[in-house]
Amino acid sequence: MNIKIVFPKHSQPDIAKATIAERLCQVASLCLNLPDYIEVHFANLGPGTYGEAILKPGINRVITVNLDLSVKEIIYPITHELIHLSQMYEGKLAISRTGLYVWEGKTYQVDPAKISYKEYMNLPWESDVTLRQKTLIEQIIG
């Protein structure tokens, strides 16, 4: 697996975060069906956003993690987004820029800004992550 870690141009790369991110991706690839190439970007996502995943045709296989999180805090969002990346890579989940989500063939129109966190976390692709994440973290950390 090829992993590229990217930090904003104006900030000094955090070697500890880069190392943790790379190791999480490597070990997760043994447990999840993931693309051969993944980029992990650290960026200023603002308060309340921990991370996001993007999988587009071609080479865009990107997980973005909030730069403000500590080394310990990045474990949860990276594993969460790796599961989403796996869902997309396997064809279970597709997300459009217009707020359309397709989960296992069923289309959902979702505006995360207009629903509660609890409602969002009960969406089927988020429920799938919730079911799988604890086990994945245990497998990674040991």
Predicted segments — roles?
Residues 16-21, 75, 121, 125-128:
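Hydrophobic (often cysteine-bearing) scaffold residues that line and stabilize catalytic clefts
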Residues 13-36:
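Zn2+-dependent metallopeptidase catalytic core
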Residues 32-38, 46, 92-142:
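Metalloprotease/metallohydrolase-associated module, dominated by Zn2+-dependent proteases
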Residues 73-81:
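Short alpha-helical catalytic segment bearing the HExxH-like zincin motif
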Residues 1-11, 32, 38-49:
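Hydrophobic or amphipathic, alpha-helical segments that drive membrane association/targeting
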Residues 1-20, 113, 142:
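N-terminal intrinsically disordered, low-complexity tails enriched in polar/charged
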Residues 43-73, 85-88, 93:
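Active-site scaffold of zinc-dependent metalloenzymes
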